[in-house]
A protein has these predicted regions:
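Binding-site signature for planar aromatic cofactors or substrates
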Residues: 1-100
Length: 100
C-alpha cells in the first residue's frame, strides 16, 4: 500500500532507533538491489532508484517516485538480529524479482 508516511509516526523501540541510521545507510549503499526487488515483489513497482527511508518493527518504508511504500515483514522484530534476519529473508525470497 502506498502511504504518505505522515499518519504513521509511532515511536521506535530504543534498539531500532539506535540502529536505524546504520541499517538504512548500509542497505541503501550495499543492498539497494534487495530494496528494489522487494518493492517490485510486494507492489509491482519497478524502480532502480528506490531507497529505504524509515524503519518500523514490522517492516520499512521504501521511497519511489515521490511515494512511500511499506514493505512488510512476516513478523514484528524485537532485536537488531531479528531485523537482519527479516531483511535477509526478503533478499532471498524476492531475488527472482531483481531488475536487470
Amino acid at each position: 500500500m502506498t502511504k504518505n508516511g505522515d499518519d504513521d509516526k509511532e515511536a521506535l523501540p530504543i534498539w531500532l532507533s539506535k540502529a536505524a541510521d546504520r541499517i538504512v545507510g548500509h542497505m541503501n549503499s550495499d543492498h539497494s538491489n534487495s530494496i528494489v526487488s522487494t518493492l517490485h515483489a510486494q507492489f509491482g513497482v519497478k524502480d532502480l532508484g528506490a531507497r529505504m527511508e524509515r524503519l518500523k518493527v514490522d517492516g520499512y518504508y521504501i521511497s519511489s517516485d515521490k511515494n512511500l511504500y511499506f514493505a512488510k515483514f512476516t513478523r514484528k522484530c524485537s532485536s537488531v538480529d531479528e531485523y537482519r534476519e527479516e531483511l535477509i529473508k526478503h533478499a532471498q525470497i524476492y531475488r527472482k524479482f531483481e531488475i536487470p
